[in-house]
């Protein structure tokens, strides 16, 4: 029986001696690797924070003390220790544990996260609320060096330092993005700063010197000038000192006694304090240590080797990367921009082939969009590759800096629609709705990976802002054309003719419509199928033609219904006076979509062939009753 078997709650953790925590850390790593190998998830980030999380929960008293996890990629140990060990096997599964902190799941998840760089702002708000209420608790924000590149984090640091609020920020530095400290003197000064005697001794010495007649103030000034010169040897720490934080570190994030010591010291600091902790991403699992980027977020894998199952089909992301390289070979104006997602957006091949035309701006989506606008002004064709959910963070820049000026910026929106196991914070189900109202913007969504290639060709040749939205995962396995052509803007594609009802689908719902039409034909209902291709502008002529022809429409989209593609079709019919046409909208309801396998989520929310078939059959029965009603009246 291991130590972990006896851990059900934080009280069990605190009953252990500090010497037992390293053994517990090893057991936690084994559990995480075993579980994530089956469920998928964020492996390397969690392996890197095992000791850090143990130390935090050993010193701080959650839930009374607040611990906010930035992004949430690294919350697995936290979940195991806070009463959810028995559920950990359900991680990221439908109706199981979320892969991110979730306030609805546990009182220990004091703030929900999923997007980056929010923790310090939230923690500062909690700290201010504590002070306003006259309460006494610690508030801790845990943020990675990658997330610290987000502007919002610096905005929060700036105000926290200005206010002098008692707040602890733990910088989990696992990539050495912040410069290494320089030389022996820097290490010495760092050791001084981690000693609680340092601040007290400094104040006592200053007080003593000020009381010495004549020479005291001069000596004090001389010491201050030396200190000001030396302190800039501690490159990273001085940035935070200048912002008003007490800087403690750097600390070995896998040395539990050192972290227990520094966290206790941080509790004693009056005012904001930043604890700089150095960790190794993927720690304790050789494949993840060797390739932490690959194991940042993974699907199921063989824990013995780290190998993942292969799929002969290519993903939409891979098609994007290949196609953009192909297009850029022929057009030197094409540039690629990503916000810290080079691999995730498929831009690895582009970055290697065209390093001078590739820009990774870090976690700075707003900057990425306006950077693209500036490049477009000067005649380039920038392609901003970004997950749908993260474009939400740059909405004003899309409107104000790109679309208002009608600049030729391409938005390649990966992970559009239901993303799956990453859950509520990552589902890309709002983009149709928030982009459709924007003037000057064209928006497309492909039915398969081959059409996607042609849409990319269309996008880079368009003389204005344009977005193409595509799903996560593999495509249909269709053949890929070698020669690409630009599609006519706003032109739909008719895939099937029928007189009984029309199915108008967009994006990855088109194959669902085609399959449903085949089943309906077997049941005596002939359906027209239209691949809309464009959310904006709509093919008004095509839609109105089939509305008049069949009198019944079903729209299909993997987006919220409110303000989405189906709503656009309804608005068109009203504008054209076709108010007698019956329209049924199949899409997502007015809720945040939880985590789970995409096929289970689609089944729950009715984005299925069966739902389309049942809806069409119901419309046929209604039509039959309407035809019968006048006869009964006679």
Curated annotation (Swiss-Prot):
Can the keyword Magnesium be found in this entry's annotation?
yes
Q: Which reaction does it catalyse?
A: D-glyceraldehyde 3-phosphate + pyruvate + H(+) = 1-deoxy-D-xylulose 5-phosphate + CO2
Q: Name one GO cellular component term.
A: cytosol
Record's InterPro entries? Dxylulose-5-P_synthase, THDP-binding, Transketo_C/PFOR_II, Transketolase-like_Pyr-bd, Transketolase_C, Transketolase_CS
Pathway the protein contributes to: Metabolic intermediate biosynthesis; 1-deoxy-D-xylulose 5-phosphate biosynthesis; 1-deoxy-D-xylulose 5-phosphate from D-glyceraldehyde 3-phosphate and pyruvate: step 1/1
Q: Which Pfam families match?
A: DXP_synthase_N, Transket_pyr, Transketolase_C
Positions bound to thiamine diphosphate: 73, 114-116, 146-147, 174, 285, 365
Family annotation (SMART domains): Transket_pyr
Task: Cite the cofactor comment.
Answer: Binds 1 Mg(2+) ion per subunit. Binds 1 thiamine pyrophosphate per subunit.
- Alphabetical UniProt keywords: Isoprene biosynthesis, Magnesium, Metal-binding, Thiamine biosynthesis, Thiamine pyrophosphate, Transferase
Quaternary structure and partners: Homodimer.
Q: Enumerate the NCBIfam families for this protein.
A: dxs, PRK05444.2-2
* Similarity annotation: Belongs to the transketolase family. DXPS subfamily.
**Name the record gives this protein:** 1-deoxy-D-xylulose-5-phosphate synthase
Organism, by scientific name, is Desulforudis audaxviator (strain MP104C)
């Amino acid at each position: 029986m291991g130590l972990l078997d006896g851990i059900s709650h934080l009280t069990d953790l605190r009953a252990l001696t500090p010497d037992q925590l390293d053994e517990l850390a090893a057991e936690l790593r084994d559990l995480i690797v075993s579980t994530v190998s089956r469920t998928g998830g964020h492996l390397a980030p969690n392996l890197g924070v095992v000791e850090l999380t143990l130390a935090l929960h050993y010193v701080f008293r959650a839930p009374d003390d607040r611990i906010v996890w930035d992004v949430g990629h690294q919350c697995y140990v936290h979940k195991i220790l806070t009463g959810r060990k028995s559920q950990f096997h359900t991680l990221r599964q439908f109706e199981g544990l979320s892969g991110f902190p979730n306030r609805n799941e546990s009182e220990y998840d004091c703030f929900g996260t999923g997007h980056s760089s929010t923790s310090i702002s939230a923690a500062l708000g909690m700290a201010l609320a504590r002070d306003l209420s006259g309460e006494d608790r610690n508030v801790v924000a845990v943020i990675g060096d990658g997330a610290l590149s987000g502007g919002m984090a610096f905005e929060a640091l700036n105000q926290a330092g200005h206010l002098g609020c008692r707040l602890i920020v733990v910088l989990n530095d696992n990539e050495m993005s912040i410069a290494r400290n320089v030389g022996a003197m820097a290490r010495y000064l760092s050791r001084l700063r981690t000693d609680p005697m340092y601040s007290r001794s400094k104040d006592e010495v200053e007080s003593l010197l000020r009381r010495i007649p004549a020479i005291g103030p001069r000596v004090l000034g001389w010491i201050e000038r030396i200190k000001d010169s030396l302190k800039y040897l501690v490159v990273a720490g001085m940035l935070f000192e200048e912002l008003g934080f007490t800087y403690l570190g750097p600390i070995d994030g896998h040395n539990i006694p050192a972290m227990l010591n520094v966290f206790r010291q941080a509790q004693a600091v009056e005012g904001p304090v930043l604890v700089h902790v150095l960790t190794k991403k993927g720690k304790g699992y050789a494949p993840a240590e060797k390739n932490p980027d690959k194991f940042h977020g993974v699907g199921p894998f063989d824990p013995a080797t780290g190998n993942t199952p292969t799929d002969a089909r290519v993903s939409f992301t891979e098609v994007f990367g290949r196609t953009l390289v192909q297009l850029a070979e022929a057009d030197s104006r094409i540039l690629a921009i990503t916000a810290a997602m080079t691999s995730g957006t498929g831009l690895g091949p582009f970055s290697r082939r065209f390093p001078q035309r590739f820009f990774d701006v870090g976690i700075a989506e707003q900057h990425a969009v306006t950077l693209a606008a500036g490049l477009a002004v000067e005649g380039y064709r920038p392609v901003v590759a970004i997950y749908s959910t993260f474009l939400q963070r740059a909405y004003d820049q899309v409107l104000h800096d790109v679309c208002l000026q009608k600049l030729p910026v391409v938005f390649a929106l990966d992970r559009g629609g239901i993303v799956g196991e990453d859950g509520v914070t990552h589902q890309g189900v709002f983009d149709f709705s928030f982009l459709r109202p924007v003037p000057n913007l064209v928006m497309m969504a492909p039915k398969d990976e081959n059409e996607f290639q042609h849409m990319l060709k269309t996008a880079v040749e368009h003389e204005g802002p344009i977005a193409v939205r595509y799903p996560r995962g593999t495509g249909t396995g269709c053949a890929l054309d070698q020669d690409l052509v630009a599609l006519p803007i706003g032109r739909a594609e008719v895939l099937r003719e029928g007189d009984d009802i029309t199915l108008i689908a967009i994006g990855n719902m088109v194959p669902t419509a085609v399959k449903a039409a085949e089943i309906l034909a077997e049941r005596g209902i002939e359906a027209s199928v239209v691949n809309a291709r464009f959310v904006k502008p709509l093919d008004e002529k095509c839609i109105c033609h089939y509305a008049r022809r069949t009198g019944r429409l079903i729209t299909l989209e993997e987006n919220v219904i409110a303000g989405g593609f189906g709503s656009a079709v309804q608005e068109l019919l009203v504008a054209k006076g076709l108010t007698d046409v019956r329209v049924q909208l199949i899409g997502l309801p007015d809720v945040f979509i939880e985590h789970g396998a995409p096929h289970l989520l689609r089944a729950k929310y009715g984005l299925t062939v069966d739902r389309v078939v049942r809806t069409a059959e119901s419309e046929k029965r209604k039509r039959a009753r309407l035809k019968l009603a006048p006869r009964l009246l006679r």
